[in-house]
Swiss-Prot record:
One of its GO terms (cellular component) is plasma membrane. It is found in: Cell inner membrane. Residues 2-184 form the tr-type G domain. Belongs to the TRAFAC class translation factor GTPase superfamily. Classic translation factor GTPase family. LepA subfamily. Its EC number is 3.6.5.n1. It is an enzyme of class 3 (hydrolase). This is Elongation factor 4.
Length: 596
């Protein structure tokens, strides 16, 4: 046991976590040079293309240290994006220490802080590593001071390395052995294993990544999942060296996988505890908290025949992604689909992309909404995540919107722009601290404003230097109303949105004009209106296409032309009473892109 080290790598986006893990694997001979691909652990196509890590992955390596001993290193590569912070907390629950990787050119960013605090809250040892020292703009001294100043951990003698060129990788490994404590646990005691992650393999069933806290799990053991009480046989156990390698047993302190031929998707929920079926542990391990979705959107398959396969795809995905929440929903405009809860807009994009790629579905998404707390006049409190579930205006006593506390780190040159943005988004400033060249500002902002496009706007006003992390604090009373779009007097439920009272004129007008561009002209006039309750606040008409019926008249009396024009008018009127308007797919997406 004293030769095992479990650690994860935490860092901000693009500070080089995945490249560093590649180097560690190479240094310890986990893969031959031929098998090395850049970003070995980013196994999904989307991860490679966007250059971000989404899923945590684990690897077991053997390292012969300078003291002559061989150590088993289990490390977990974690995502750095704010939407995936629950992945990070999950990986940390399985470790004793973390490497905090900081780009020696960029310095500390908000996400570095957020993940680092998560680690410190769990009483873990955080070891700073300065990466990218080969860059001309690298300034390790300044960054070391920044780490001590902003994060508050010793960094004067932090290891300096360059994952790209391989300088200092040996030192990183030595620091891991020296500074990260070995796991504690009772080998003789009853088995307790924490499920860090699970995914569905169409041949093997559910594959679970586990960290053994106490006891030993042998191949062929009967074990039970503590939350469901189901028992299974461990058909195969083993480790990833990144390749899947079978072993005879997993001992206390080790991280590895278990395959038990579990076929139902929720057989081994993430964060659960495994123990032996006979003489098992009494109580489960305290893992990590379940995350609540922050943003909801309706997602519908473009062809209704895909509904069943869409449901299967969601089931399989939710096994791998503990934070996904979904329930069936119907819409008069879009048919059958699901209301899905996401952690943020990036998460929503990724899930939609994974569904479209991995399961070949064509999907359409409605505008994302956050959860509102509503006090009805009858005194009941309800939570609404869908604009069409909103009670009538006269039944609402008070509407409360979720407020998040946002911590933003920004270089002081861009401070003005960022403050202007926060004010425009109805933010309230709580705190501002200068750290050298960086400024840390804390704002309370409505979550609805943050999830829509705040992240992109923040990046563009600060030329990409600002970084943010946010967490929910409370519900606060607000003047929110539902904006409906009516087409020829009929409400289109998929276009409704909940917005602040001060924005209804501008938003309503923008939306109506956008619809006017996107809905194709018909043979009759179409009225597009934006309404709040029964009050119409904006309108525009899409003019009818008409045939020139008087073209064949040559000379003759004017009453002849009038007759033809009146006949055409009658026809249009009749057509309007029976015609219905097809709203194209782009129109639904326009709601998302209103601010462009």
């Amino acid at each position: 046991m004293k030769h095992i080290r479990n650690f994860s790598i935490i860092a901000h986006i693009d500070h080089g976590k995945s490249t560093l893990s590649d180097r560690l694997i190479q240094e310890c001979g986990g893969l031959s040079d031929r098998e090395m691909a850049a970003q070995v652990l980013d196994s999904m196509d989307i991860e490679r293309e966007r250059g971000i890590t989404i899923k945590a992955q684990s690897v077991t390596l053997d390292y012969k240290a300078l003291d002559g001993e061989t150590y088993q290193l289990n490390f977990i590569d974690t995502p750095g994006h704010v939407d995936f912070s629950y992945e990070v907390s999950r990986s940390l629950a399985a470790c004793e220490g973390a490497l905090l990787v900081v780009d020696a050119g960029q310095g500390v960013e908000a996400q570095t802080l957020a993940n680092c605090y998560t680690a410190l809250e769990m009483d873990m040892d955080v070891v700073p590593v300065l990466n990218k020292i080969d860059l001309p703009q690298a300034d390790p001294e300044r960054v070391a001071d920044e780490i001590e100043d902003i994060v508050g951990i010793e960094a004067a003698d932090a290891v300096r390395c360059s994952a790209k060129t391989g300088i200092g990788i040996k030192d990183v490994l030595e620091v891991i052995v020296a500074q990260i404590p070995p796991p504690e646990g009772d080998t003789e005691g009853p088995l307790q294993a924490l499920i860090i992650d699970s995914w569905f393999d169409s041949y093997l069933g559910v594959v679970s990544l586990v960290r053994i806290k106490n006891g030993i799990l042998k191949k062929g053991d009967k074990f039970k999942v503590m939350s469901t009480g189901q028992t299974y046989n461990a058909d195969r156990v083993g480790i990833f060296t990144p390749k899947q390698t079978d072993t005879a047993e997993l001992k206390t302190g080790e991280v590895g996988f278990v395959i038990a031929g579990i076929k139902e998707i929720h057989g081994a929920p993430v964060g659960d505890t495994l123990t032996h079926a006979k003489h098992g542990a009494e109580k489960p391990l305290g893992g990590f908290k379940k995350v609540k979705p922050q943003v909801y959107a309706g997602v519908f398959p473009i062809s209704t025949d895909d509904y069943e396969s869409f449901r299967d795809a969601l089931n399989k995905l939710s096994l791998n992604d503990a934070s996904l929440f979904f329930e069936p929903e119907t819409s008069s405009a879009l048919g059958f689909g699901f209301r899905i809860g996401f952690l943020g807009l990036l998460h929503m994009e990724i899930i939609q992309e994974r569904l479209e790629r991995e399961y070949n579905l064509d999907l359409i998404t409605t505008a994302p909404t956050v959860v509102y707390e509503i006090v009805k006049t009858s005194g009941d409190t309800i939570y609404v995540d869908n604009p069409s579930d909103l009670p009538a205006i006269n039944n609402i006593a008070e509407m409360r919107e979720p407020i998040v506390e946002t911590n933003i780190l920004v270089p002081k040159d861009y401070l003005g722009n960022v403050i202007t943005l926060c004010v425009e988004k109805r933010g309230v400033q709580k705190n501002m601290v200068y750290h050298g060249n960086q400024v840390a500002i804390t704002y309370e902002l409505p979550m609805a404003e943050v999830v829509m496009d705040f992240f992109d706007r923040l990046k563009s006003t600060s030329r990409g230097y600002a970084s943010l992390e946010y967490n929910f604090v409370r519900f606060e009373p607000a003047d929110m109303v539902r904006l409906d779009i009516l087409i020829n007097g009929d409400r289109v439920d998929a276009l409704a949105m909940i917005i602040h009272k001060g924005l209804i004129r501008t938003k309503g007008l923008a939306l109506v004009n956008k619809m006017k561009e996107l809905i194709p002209r018909q043979m009759f006039d179409i009225a597009v209106q934006a309404a709040v309750g029964s009050q119409i606040i904006a309108r525009s008409s899409i003019k009818a296409m008409r045939k020139d019926v008087t073209a064949k008249c040559y000379g003759g009396d004017v009453s002849r032309k009038k007759k033809l024009l009146n006949k055409q008018k009658e026809g249009k009127k009749r057509m309007k009473s029976v015609g219905n308007v097809e709203v194209p797919q782009e129109a639904f997406l326009a709601v998302l892109k209103l601010n462009d």
